[in-house]
C-alpha cells in the first residue's frame, strides 16, 4: 500500500449527500477479485449524465473527492474503495462517512477526512470557482489546507500510523514474519505451517 503523509492535489466537488456504496460502484462491477480495474464502474450510473462532475475535464486530474454528508453508506463493499483509488483519489472529504466504508477506506489506503459541512461548502465554492485550486491533506498535522484556510480533522493514532507507513492488513502481518517463522519452527513438524 502506498504511504500517505501529505498529499496536495486538485479536488472534485461532489455536491451530493447520502451516497451509498451501490452508487459508488454498482453490483454489476463486483465480479472481479483483484483490487484493480474498477475505475470504469465508479459512479457509472451518474457518469451517463454529461453534466456529472467527473465528466468535466476541469476535474479530470482530481485526486481528492469532496462529498456531502453520509458518504459511503450501505453495504460493505471494498470495491467502492478500490474504484475510488483506481480513479486516482487519495482522500475523500465529507461531514460524515458510513462506518463500514470508513473502515474499508482506511484499510485500503484511501483517507476519509471528516470536516464540518461549512468547511466542505467552502472547499466546494473554492474549487468550483477555480478547479486548479490546490488542496492539501496533511495527515502528519491532521489538517486540510486550501489557500489561507486550514481545518483540523481527527483520526485515531493507529489508523494514522498505518497510512503513514503504507501498511494494509497483510503488510502489518508481514512486519511480524520473523516471529511467525520462529513460532512455526518451534511446533511439531506434523502441524501445518503458512510457508
Swiss-Prot record:
It catalyses: (2R,3S)-3-isopropylmalate = (2S)-2-isopropylmalate. The keyword Amino-acid biosynthesis applies. GO terms for cellular component: 3-isopropylmalate dehydratase complex. Pathway: Amino-acid biosynthesis; L-leucine biosynthesis; L-leucine from 3-methyl-2-oxobutanoate: step 2/4. GO terms for biological process: L-leucine biosynthetic process. InterPro entries: 3-IsopropMal_deHydase_ssu, Aconitase/3IPM_dehydase_swvl, AconitaseA/IPMdHydase_ssu_swvl, IPMI_Swivel, LeuD. CDD domains: IPMI_Swivel. Disulfide bonds: none annotated. The keyword Lyase applies. Pfam families: Aconitase_C. Keywords: Amino-acid biosynthesis, Branched-chain amino acid biosynthesis, Leucine biosynthesis, Lyase. Heterodimer of LeuC and LeuD. Its EC number is 4.2.1.33. GO terms for molecular function: 3-isopropylmalate dehydratase activity. Belongs to the LeuD family. LeuD type 1 subfamily. The gene is leuD. It comes from Salinispora arenicola (strain CNS-205). Catalyzes the isomerization between 2-isopropylmalate and 3-isopropylmalate, via the formation of 2-isopropylmaleate. This is 3-isopropylmalate dehydratase small subunit.
Amino acid at each position: 500500500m502506498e504511504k500517505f503523509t501529505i498529499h496536495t492535489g486538485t479536488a472534485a466537488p461532489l455536491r451530493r449527500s447520502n451516497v451509498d456504496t451501490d452508487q459508488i460502484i454498482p453490483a454489476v462491477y463486483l465480479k472481479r477479485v483483484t483490487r484493480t480495474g474498477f475505475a470504469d464502474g465508479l459512479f457509472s450510473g451518474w457518469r451517463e449524465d454529461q453534466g456529472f462532475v467527473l465528466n468535466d475535464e476541469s476535474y479530470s486530474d482530481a485526486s481528492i473527492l469532496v462529498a456531502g454528508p453520509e458518504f459511503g453508506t450501505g453495504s460493505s463493499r471494498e470495491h467502492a474503495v478500490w474504484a475510488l483509488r483506481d480513479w486516482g483519489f487519495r482522500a475523500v472529504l465529507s461531514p460524515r462517512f458510513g462506518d463500514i466504508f470508513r473502515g474499508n477506506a482506511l484499510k485500503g489506503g484511501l483517507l476519509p477526512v471528516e470536516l464540518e459541512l461549512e468547511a466542505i461548502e467552502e472547499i466546494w465554492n473554492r474549487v468550483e470557482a477555480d478547479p486548479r485550486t490546490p488542496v492539501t491533506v496533511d495527515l502528519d498535522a491532521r489538517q486540510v489546507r486550501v489557500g489561507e484556510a486550514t481545518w483540523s480533522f481527527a483520526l485515531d493514532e493507529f489508523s494514522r500510523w498505518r497510512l503513514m507507513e503504507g501498511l494494509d492488513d497483510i503488510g502489518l502481518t508481514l512486519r511480524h514474519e520473523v516471529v511467525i517463522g520462529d513460532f512455526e519452527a518451534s511446533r511439531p513438524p506434523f502441524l501445518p505451517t503458512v510457508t
